[in-house]
Amino acid sequence: MTNAEHRRESELTRSELNTQKWVCLFATKNYRGRSRELARRVGNHVFKIVVGKQFDGDGREIEVGVLKVPAYKVLVALFHIWESRGKPLDWVTSSLYELADVMDRRWGGSLAKELKDQLRSLRDIPIQWIGFFYRGEDRYISILEDQPLRFIKVKFLTTKKAGREIECRFMFKFDERILENLLLGYTKPVRLDVISKLSEIATLVYCHVDVVMADKTEYTRRSRELFEDLGLTSKRYKYPSWRKAALERVIEELVGKPLTTGILTDISLRPTKDRKDFNVRFVKEPFRRPVSQKSDAEVRELVEEMERVLGVGDKNRGFYITIARNCPAELIRAALKDTVEEERSGRITGSKAQFFGYWIQYLAAKRGIDLGLKSSFGELLDTG
C-alpha cells in the first residue's frame, strides 16, 4: 500500500493525551495482580499511577482489579462515538452493536459479554494520578492522589424477550477531567482501525512509538527499558530471551503499519555492546509534506485571517506562517470556522489560538498531511 493510499484510508480518533502517554496503565491478560503501580521519572520529577486501589467504608485500602488492554480499545472507541455525536457535555447513548462496529469486531453473544465487561471495568476501576500538576499555560488538568479517576460512568438499557436479552443499549459519560481535556483539545490522534486488530503487547508497543516518534523518523530503546515503559513487569520479562521472543512476534504485526504521522517501515533487534541486552530500533517513513503552491501574498492573507480570528502574538505568528505555507487554505479556513463555532457554544475554556493549534493538527493528521512542525499539540502557541 502506498503512502497516498494510507492517507486516504486514515481514520483517526482523538484520544485524551494523558491516556495515550500512559497507555502502559492497561495490563495484558497475563497480569494476575488485583492492583498495580507504575512510575516514570522526567528530570527530577516522578509521576506515579496507581490502578485498582481504593478505601472501603472502614477506611481500609482494598484492591478491586486492574484495567487491561481490551478496555483501552473500548475507551478509544468511546472517544470516537462521543466525537461523532458532536462532543456533548452530558450522557451519550450507544449500543453494544455500534461499539463492535466502530471497533470492526464481528458481532456475537460472547462479544457482547466481553464489551459489557470492559465497560464495567472502565466504570469501576479507580486510577490515582500522583504528581500530575495543573499548568496554566497549557491547561494541563491536575489529577490528585485523593481524587481517583474512573474513566466513565455507564448505564445499561437492556431489552429482553422471553427472558432472553435481544438488545443492549447503554449510556456513557466521561469523567469531568477527561471530558475537559477532550474539549480543550488536549488530545492525541489514534488509529483505531489499526489498534483494534493488534495483539495486546503489539498495541502497547504501537501506541508508545506513535507518541514518541511523532516528531522523529528513528527511535532506539534498550529492550529492558522499553518493557518498563510499557508496564510489562512480569517475571518472565526479566530475561532478554523472553523479551526478544515477544518482540519478534510484535515485529511481524507492526512492520508496514501506519502510525498517525507516517509508516512504520522497520523494527530491528541488535545486541548491546556488553551483549547483556539488545537495542530495539524503530524506523518511520513520514507522510510526504505537500509542496506549497502558495504565493507570498496568499501566505500573508492566510496569516492575517488567523490573526483576525485568533489574535496576534510574536510566538503565534511563526506558527501561523508555518501553517499557511504547509496546509491547504480550505483546511485552515475550516479550522478557523470550527474554532469560532466552538467559542460561541462555550466549549473553549482556554484560548482560541490553542484550540485552533490542536484542531488544525488533528485535521491535517487525519488527511496524512505533515505540517512541518517541530512541536505539537499547541506547544508553539501563546495561550493568552
Question: Where are the model-predicted features located?
Answer:
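Append "and, occasionally, other polyanion-binding protein interfaces
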Residues: 217-219, 223, 233-246, 291-384
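Charged, alpha-helix-forming regions
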Residues: 1-298
